[in-house]
């Protein structure tokens, strides 16, 4: 039976019987922590628990935390620290944007297993591609800070610098 908890501001769910090993499951854009259930069904019998969190702005989170790396990465680092206090062995299972954020949150940390699906590994290249599609130069983005583009997204100089 899943156990619903909160780690800092992050809603989380823990799957599996107590174990010495745990995966952090980080969903992608428009996902949610419950996506971890299928993965947990595979690894729980192998002696791994699965802890999954909702990224900022997902699954009804209305706590004001935005899905930007300077807010999401420290939140995932807090989850990582929570895990290090409770499990001897850590793994990461992450999807797309969640993979990029998780890799930053776990930089320099020992991870026994790292399973990434459709990982976004080069955020800078992706943002530069979106700039080109929108016909926006880096100089204009630097000057304006943020520029809304078709499709409901906003290009951000701060985000590009972070990447």
What are these regions (language model features)?
Residues 40-62:
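Conserved alpha/beta-hydrolase
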Residues 58-86:
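Catalytic nucleophile-loop/oxyanion-hole region of alpha/beta-hydrolase
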């Amino acid at each position: 039976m899943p156990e619903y908890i909160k780690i800092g501001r992050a809603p989380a769910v823990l799957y599996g019987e107590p174990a010495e090993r745990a995966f952090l499951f980080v969903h992608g854009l428009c996902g949610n922590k419950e996506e971890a259930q299928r993965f947990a069904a595979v690894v729980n019998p192998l002696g791994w628990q699965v802890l999954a969190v909702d990224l900022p702005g997902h699954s009804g989170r209305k706590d004001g935390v935005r899905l930007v790396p300077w807010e999401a990465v420290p939140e995932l680092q807090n989850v990582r620290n929570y895990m290090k206090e409770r499990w001897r062995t850590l793994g990461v299972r992450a999807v797309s944007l969640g993979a990029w954020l998780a890799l930053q949150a776990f930089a320099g940390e020992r991870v026994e297993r790292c399973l990434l699906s459709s990982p976004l590994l080069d955020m800078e290249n992706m943002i530069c591609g979106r700039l080109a599609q929108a016909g926006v130069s880096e100089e204009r983005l630097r000057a304006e800070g943020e520029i809304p583009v078709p499709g409901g997204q906003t290009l951000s100089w701060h985000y590009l610098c972070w990447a």
